[in-house]
Amino acid sequence: MLVNDWVETVWNVVQVRPKTLHDYKRLYRRHLMPVIGSMPVNDVDVVALQQKLLSLPPQSARHCLMLVKTIYREAKLYKVTNINPADGLKTAPIQISDKKFLTWPEVDAKDWGRYNNQIRFLALHGLRWSEAAAITQADIRDEFVFVSRTVNGPCKSKTSVRKVPYLGWFKPLPASYKPMQKCANRHGVTVHSFRRTYAYLLKTQGVHVTTAQKLLGHSDPMMTLRVYTSVLDSEIDDAGALLANYLNRKI
């Protein structure tokens, strides 16, 4: 049996969310099928697979490696093979850098063209794009936005089902993610960065981190804490001024 043949079975039996399955298929078609698709399941060229992984950006390589492991985990489960060519393979370390985001005043000062309303809505409510794209006027009532689904189906987790105070600017989002991402990129940010705008707004207005966790729909409080520890250069300057004022009062 060829890897391509087995993968078609995997898509039917693997237990993942529809969005995850969509991503699996895209990754396989783009990166893995040209390399291992025509190889026998029991005789994948490990060197060729490793070379492919090393040729990819670290994050893509990591996702592809996890997908190969998933494909062969299912193969072992269904007695198709007893090997996994992904065992022992490595990918380059993922470099984590500070993610750029805009503060609310910066967002509000910019012209976002045809997406003026939608961008401001994202920045003031902290919804994931897939959540915001599923919102209709019926989901906005009693001065709250009720988040109960995404464009891909159910919410990411139970904690993603929530309500957030409605602060205006609602206008239906486009059916595709790409136009708004292109709009955001022109200003050096991403659509997802507007969640950080919202989180930073909560932080600067004194909203407690546990409340922010609820509003952002984070299942892990550490995710919220990582956002809450975002510090702008201006805050460093302000901290210096505060300490200087304190010392001057003591003298």
Model-derived regions: residue spans:
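Short, basic, alpha-helical segments at the C-terminal edge of helix-turn-helix-like DNA-binding modules
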Residues: 241-247
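Catalytic-site neighborhood detector that most strongly recognizes the C-terminal catalytic loop/helix
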Residues: 151, 216-241
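Conserved tyrosine-mediated DNA breakage-rejoining catalytic core shared by Y-recombinases
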Residues: 88-94, 134-169
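N-terminal core-binding DNA-recognition domain of tyrosine site-specific recombinases/integrases
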Residues: 11-73, 78-80, 96, 175-182, ...
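Basic, Lys/Arg- and aromatic-enriched nucleic-acid-binding interface segment
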Residues: 58-66, 77-133, 195, 246
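Short, structural beta-strand-to-alpha-helix junction motif
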Residues: 1-6, 40, 136
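Short, basic (Lys/Arg/His-rich) helix/loop patches that form interaction surfaces
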Residues: 112-116, 125, 177-222
